[in-house]
């Protein structure tokens, strides 16, 4: 999956979970996402997005938020 598709998917999932996307960057092939969770805390998650399916990304985000 390309970076732009993964980022768009992550933004959509965060929006459904009432979270706010802040920024993203790539380091060594890993997509690092910063966002505000439902309680207003800043969170950071890392995704090896090239090797993940849409379902895997969604599960990682849900586990990270809750």
Where are the regions a protein language model picked out?
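Negatively charged, low-complexity tracts enriched in Asp/Glu with abundant Ser/Thr
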Residues: 1-20, 53, 58, 62-66
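Acidic, low-complexity, intrinsically disordered interaction modules
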Residues: 17-60
